[in-house]
Amino acid sequence: MTEQAAKPKGWFKRALEKYDNFIKEWGLDQPNCSCVPMSATEDENGNLKKKESSLKK
């Protein structure tokens, strides 16, 4: 098992981790009401920033 831990992750495993992080960051992994839309804006680097709807208060 130590040989596998030292091996770098393949592109698929890295992509899967990024997808999992995205799902957790946006709260899509939890069952909740999807009737309240969320909007996203881009920062100066072009990355999406999460911005919750004003209706969700």
UniProtKB/Swiss-Prot annotation:
It comes from the Bacteria. It holds the Pfam family DUF5363. It comes from Haemophilus influenzae (strain ATCC 51907 / DSM 11121 / KW20 / Rd). This is Uncharacterized protein HI_1257. InterPro entries: DUF5363 (IPR035292).
